[in-house]
């Protein structure tokens, strides 16, 4: 049986292999294992190696690896002299080399797997971002459709076209004013609404109308008032 004293586990010689294996599996503290193996006799280390190596070849548990590591480091010289351990040590070496080779492949696969996962994560983020943009575009299209259904027509007005229309309106207005002015100055121009209204409404009775002789008499009395006499300078020029 094995006994624990402080930080050291004491193994008895010729102890049962199952008890040794159980004790080693229950302890994985590097400090306790190293102190125990250093204070251990070579024969006990050989017995412990005979028990741990076959178990290690079947299932490489971390606690067994710690025990074998310190046994080989501390008592490796003595173990090479034990003949019945040579085959077990060779098998352990082959197993460790194979495990190291597999570990290299595992690390390589792990790196590739991490790269693939990172790419997949980036691709998923892009898909999420594009889906969000698509939803925003659908919302904008839905709003535009609502505006069209409501009957709101949005017309883009060209400023140059507006200026041309304003110039045409001003030209038409000027032409209209000139035509009205010419019509009003012509001898055949119609009377204003107010004057025509007076002419139509005001009718002189026949009994009050003047005869031709009376009209000539009135003209003789009125015309001299509107005749402007010529200046003495003009009369002198005519006499010359």
From Swiss-Prot:
Protein name as catalogued: Uncharacterized protein C1450.03
Record GO biological process: maturation of SSU-rRNA from tricistronic rRNA transcript (SSU-rRNA, 5.8S rRNA, LSU-rRNA)
Annotated spans, Disordered: 125-148, 177-240
Keyword terms: Cytoplasm, Nucleus, Phosphoprotein
Subcellular location: Cytoplasm; Nucleus
Biological classification of the source: Eukaryota, Fungi, Dikarya, Ascomycota, Taphrinomycotina
Origin superkingdom: Eukaryota
Biased composition (Acidic residues): 130-148, 204-217
Family that this chain belongs to: Belongs to the UTP5 family.
């Amino acid at each position: 049986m094995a006994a624990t004293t402080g930080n050291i586990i004491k193994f008895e010689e010729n102890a049962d292999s199952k008890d040794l294996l159980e004790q080693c599996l229950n302890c994985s503290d590097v400090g306790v294992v190293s102190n125990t193996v250093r204070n251990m006799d070579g024969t006990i280390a050989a017995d412990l190696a005979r028990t741990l190596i076959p178990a290690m070849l079947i299932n490489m548990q971390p606690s067994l690896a710690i025990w074998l590591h310190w046994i080989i480091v501390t008592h490796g010289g003595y173990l090479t002299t034990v003949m019945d351990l040579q085959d077990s040590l060779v098998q352990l070496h082959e197993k460790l080399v194979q495990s190291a080779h597999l570990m290299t492949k595992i690390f390589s696969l792990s790196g590739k797997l991490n790269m693939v996962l990172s790419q997949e994560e980036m691709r998923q983020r892009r898909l999420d971002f594009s889906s969000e943009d698509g939803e925003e575009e659908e919302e904008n299209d839905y709003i535009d459709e609502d505006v069209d259904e409501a009957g709101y027509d949005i017309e883009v007005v060209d400023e140059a076209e507006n200026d041309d229309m304003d110039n045409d309106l001003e030209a038409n207005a000027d032409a209209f004013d000139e035509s009205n002015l010419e019509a009003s100055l012509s001898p055949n121009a119609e009377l204003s609404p107010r004057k025509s209204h007076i002419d139509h409404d005001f009718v002189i009775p026949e009994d009050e109308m003047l005869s031709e002789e009376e009209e000539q008499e009135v003209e003789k009395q009125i015309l001299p008032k509107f005749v402007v006499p010529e200046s003495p300078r003009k009369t002198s020029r005519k006499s010359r």
